Amino acid sequence: MKFEAVVRTEQGKGASRRLRHAGQFPAIVYGGTEAPVSIALDHDAVINQMDKPAFYEAIELVIDGAVVKVKPQDVQRHAFKPKVEHMDFIRI
């Protein structure tokens, strides 16, 4: 599975709300020897793949042209809507 990701320049609650309103959601990639990277992912592309078992094993994120292999570490969902609020990915 491969997803396109964009590095986030704005941080905070307001920036995250603007992302969600635009059909994206914030996420972070951490682990390994590299520094953590805040990214934004397309909500519809990710939510449609989350019901597949392969999603939780290994994912390739294309972050500014570089391919990073990750695994979902944590998913924060909306309380009653079928929406993802935030995701944590760990490098593998």
Curated annotation (Swiss-Prot):
GO biological-process terms attached to the record: translation
SUPFAM superfamilies reported in the protein's UniProt record: Ribosomal protein L25-like
Keyword terms of this UniProt record: Ribonucleoprotein, Ribosomal protein, RNA-binding, rRNA-binding
GO molecular function, one term: structural constituent of ribosome
Pfam families linked to this entry: Ribosomal_L25p
Gene3D superfamilies: Ribosomal Protein L25, Chain P
GO CC annotation, single: cytosolic large ribosomal subunit
Keyword set includes Ligase: no
Subunit structure: Part of the 50S ribosomal subunit; part of the 5S rRNA/L5/L18/L25 subcomplex. Contacts the 5S rRNA. Binds to the 5S rRNA independently of L5 and L18.
Function as written in the Swiss-Prot or TrEMBL entry: This is one of the proteins that binds to the 5S RNA in the ribosome where it forms part of the central protuberance.
Family the entry assigns: Belongs to the bacterial ribosomal protein bL25 family.
Protein name (Swiss-Prot/TrEMBL): Large ribosomal subunit protein bL25
Source organism (scientific name): Aliivibrio fischeri (strain MJ11) (Vibrio fischeri)
Gene label: rplY
